[in-house]
Regions:
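Catalytic cores of phosphodiester-bond hydrolases, prominently lipid phosphodiesterases
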Residues: 21-24, 28, 32, 36-393
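N-terminal Lys/Arg-rich, disordered targeting/topogenic segments
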Residues: 1-19
Length: 393
């Protein structure tokens, strides 16, 4: 009899476990269906966003050309500087002796509502472990330049279309693809327009970061050396004489290590009104450099890493973490005479401790996700004590 009741209890327990398991499976399936529906909706919205991005960028450029600059007053660079610019120029201050404020993902604007819903749902089901970053939003490139930003970062994704090769400026081509400057050529044209109307501006650097991991559908392609050389051509054709190339910086030196050993970067005066384009370290960096190790034929300066500090072609180095930069920059900047980029924060996180390290490290390009905004409603801003560029010496 006891065995009989034991079997009954065991059967009841098994039935309960089966019901619990089935309930869990049902919940997982429901979550999966919800996420799949949101994912599909995001893809559809992302596809519609592409044309919207292009239309908005074209309209913005037309506005700049035909209305914005008609009665335009150039930006007051001195009001943005933590030092007297003319005195610095007169004393021969060099480009690598000035710190400039930049922005991270300078093209980014609010995502589609569908993508926002997808990311917030993922975050909810993952108990807050997924950082949605859906509130991240930057002003237009022109607005950022007006406010004193002198380093811009542009992510580039290659797309083959019926009309040819295009280079798209966005974060993720199929989902998170909203952008204030979706076409690379038009983005460069916008920057060139601002530069032409501010001929004495502090030197501008543009970081071009090719996205290596791309799902090859809808014409999107993995970045290659051939595509990199096409970007070079677009840069030269669009920026024209405003572009300062590696060859311009190198002059008659044997290589860039020789230039750095001589502590002979171009002066602030010689780089004023100029634009330099920097190729973020990527899969094609080595082959891009190998085309000419003196960089005499390339339009972009390769941005390399700490381990490349003594190479003959190294000029700009990525050292994003302020903690690391504080330790390594004495060698990179004081001894190797390199220009270093460091990130002061990483949206949505920031801290006084990280900002203190960013201020201490001495990097010449400090990028932030919390710059001044055109609408002036931000409760939190990172800058150089109210200024946008400062002397390092």
């Amino acid at each position: 009899m006891l065995q009989y009741f034991g079997v009954i209890n065991m059967t009841k327990t098994k039935n309960k476990l089966v019901k619990i398991l089935l309930s869990i499976i049902a919940v997982i399936l429901c979550i999966g269906i919800i996420l799949l529906s949101l994912f599909v909706a995001s893809l559809v919205a992302g596809n519609k966003t592409i044309q919207n991005n292009i239309d908005l960028q074209n309209q913005h450029l037309e506005y700049l050309k035909n209305e914005y600059y008609k009665n335009y007053t150039p930006c007051d660079e001195q009001a943005l500087a933590k030092f007297n610019i003319e005195e610095a120029i007169a004393s021969g201050v060099k480009f690598n002796e000035v710190a400039f404020l930049g922005t991270h993902n300078s093209y980014q604007i609010y995502p589609s509502k569908q993508y926002e819903a997808l990311m917030k749902t993922l975050d909810f089901f993952a108990f807050g472990l997924v950082e949605t970053k859906t509130e991240f939003n930057m002003d237009t490139l022109t607005q950022q330049l007006e406010l004193g930003i002198r380093n811009l970062e542009i992510d580039v994704i290659t797309q083959e279309t019926e009309s040819g090769t295009s280079f798209r400026v966005c974060h993720t081509p199929l989902l998170d693809n909203t952008s204030s400057c979706y076409d690379l050529k038009n983005a460069l044209e916008e920057i060139k327009l601002w530069s032409d109307n501010n001929p004495n501006h502090m030197p501008i650097t543009i970081i071009v970061e090719p996205k290596g991991k791309v799902v090859e559908i809808n014409g999107f392609k993995k970045f290659s050396l051939d595509y990199c050389n096409q970007v070079d051509t677009i840069i030269r054709d669009t920026l024209g004489e405003t572009l300062l190339t590696p060859a311009d910086m190198l002059r008659d030196y044997k290589n860039f290590k020789a230039m750095r050993d001589a502590d002979d970067w171009l002066t602030l005066q010689e780089t004023r009104g100029k634009i330099m384009v920097l190729l973020h370290d990527c899969d094609v960096t080595d082959s891009y450099i190998a085309q000419n190790e003196r960089l005499k034929t390339q339009a972009m300066f390769p941005m390399l890493r700490y381990d490349d500090r003594n190479e003959t072609y190294t000029t700009f180095v990525l050292n994003n973490n302020p903690d690391t930069a504080v330790v390594q920059n004495k060698e990179l900047i004081d001894e190797c005479k390199l220009v270093v980029r460091t990130r002061a924060d990483d949206y949505p996180t920031f801290s006084d401790e990280r900002y203190s390290k960013a201020n201490e490290c001495g990097s010449q390009i400090i990028t932030t996700d919390y710059p001044r905004r055109a609408n002036k409603t931000e409760s939190h801003i990172y800058d150089f004590d109210g200024y946008m560029f400062e002397l390092l010496k």
